[in-house]
Amino acid sequence: VYSGFSPMELYDEYGYTSYGFGVAKQTLHSVCKQLKSVLKRQKLKLVILEADILYQPNIKKQGSIHYDYAWLFAPFMYHSRWKDLKLRDFFTLPNLNRGNFTNGYFYSDKVNDFNVKPDYMKDIHKPPQKMEKSINKDFYKIYKLCKKYDVPLLVISIPTPHSWDNAKSNGVKELCERYNLDFYDMNLGLDGFDYSCHFRDNGNHCNYNGAKVVTLALGKYLQENYSLANHKGKSNFENWDKKLIEYKKAIASYSHKK
């Protein structure tokens, strides 16, 4: 989600304040810990979980503590070079994230000419793919946490033809129906998303243009299904407006350099 969702684009278009806490190779177990910590300190209006993590390994392996606790520190984007970090790196974000005005979003304007199989979501009747027992257990914990703090939980799936199909989509749909949760799967169709130029890799991570399409579609879905306040330009949210200016300047500057 750190590549496919831009909180500042959401704020610019809909005035919703948000933060993306995703990190690479994150486990659902770590998300559960993360959410518990956040809910103790913040009054959230909505929690959004990206569904791809429900089919990722959830077992601790050597070095996984780096991923499980990466969200506690600033360098979300440094996950592949922990041993090379300097002390200052634990308090500053790299590249466009310096100053933290991207709110967890990882910017990339790289375009990979990806040829998606047009039928990767064709078989809508595929049997639901089962999830690990630990995934079901941790998902239930997340569900209970949201219930405890009276926060709606929305599950989404960002376009990911590299690893997604209808078996997984139906598995998540079945899981969400069990707990009476909303599930928004953008793989089933997303207006304006171009699979040939909206990825920075082989169909797994969106680039900036892809993230904009995803973010605005998500914003529309939230507007139609949830009662969230538009804070843009309102008093007490001046810092967000200043952050948005920084964000736009940084992206314009970076794009110009390219």
Give the label of every model feature segment:
Residues 1-79:
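Membrane-embedded segments
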Residues 11, 146, 175-176:
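A generic structural signal for well-ordered alpha-helical segments
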Residues 21-24, 50-52, 156-159, 186-189, ...:
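Active-site-proximal beta-strand/loop segments in catalytic clefts of secreted hydrolases
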Residues 25-29, 131-133, 161-168:
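Acidic-and-aromatic substrate-binding clefts and catalytic sites of carbohydrate-active enzymes
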Residues 35, 139-143, 169, 173, ...:
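Generic structural signal for well-ordered alpha-helices
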Residues 51, 60-152, 231-258:
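Secreted/periplasmic serine-hydrolase-like ester/acetyl group-modifying domain
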Residues 170-240, 254-257:
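C-terminal regions of proteins
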